[in-house]
């Protein structure tokens, strides 16, 4: 009898933990920009390192008053690292590239920006405005670009941002908006 009760309790506990794991929702953040709000679901299961990194920066207020410094129609909008006076904000150590997570750089996805070194991403990110298949394939450096979330509300705002007039300021700031587009805040909703 005791053995049957233990089996039943074990099965119930396992069922409850599976149900809890399945019921866990992905975090959602609201990015308030000077052109409107964008809600982004973050894919914690597929990109745990990138999501934790992004949430750490968001929760610390790091993204507040940064700009979208690279805006390219037919490609993407990039931000999260510079102030309006083109000063780069100090970041934490780079993270491991999670591009092999199975997620694709499709329209509306958010990915980690990086240099030509695969594991060089810190705070900067980009939102794809079209399907960017070439970013999924390993580049000459051996890696693609890590998707870690998707816009779930406010893609019209992203489209507004990508349509602003841009300029080439210098070799570092190519395709920079003439009038800065600010990230006012990034708040975790759930």
Task: Please identify what each model-predicted range represents.
Residues 2-9, 13, 19-190:
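Cyclophilin-like peptidyl-prolyl cis-trans isomerases
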């Amino acid at each position: 009898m005791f053995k049957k009760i233990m089996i039943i309790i074990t099965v119930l506990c396992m069922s409850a933990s599976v149900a809890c794991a399945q019921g866990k929702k992905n975090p959602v953040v609201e990015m308030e920009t000077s052109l409107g709000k964008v809600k982004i679901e973050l894919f914690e299961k597929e990109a745990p390192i990138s999501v934790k990194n992004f949430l750490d920066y968001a929760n610390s207020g790091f993204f507040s008053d940064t700009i979208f410094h690279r805006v390219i129609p037919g490609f993407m909008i990039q931000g999260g690292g510079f102030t309006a006076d083109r000063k780069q904000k100090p970041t934490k150590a780079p993270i491991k590239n999670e591009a092999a997570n199975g997620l694709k750089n499709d329209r509306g996805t958010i990915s980690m920006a990086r240099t030509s070194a695969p594991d060089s991403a810190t705070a900067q990110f980009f939102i794809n405005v079209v399907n960017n298949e070439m970013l999924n394939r390993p580049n000459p450096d051996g890696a693609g670009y890590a998707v870690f979330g998707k816009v779930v509300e406010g893609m019209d705002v992203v489209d507004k941002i990508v349509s602003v007039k841009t300029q080439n300021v210098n070799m570092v700031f190519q395709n920079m908006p003439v009038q800065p587009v600010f990230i006012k805040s990034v708040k975790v909703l759930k």
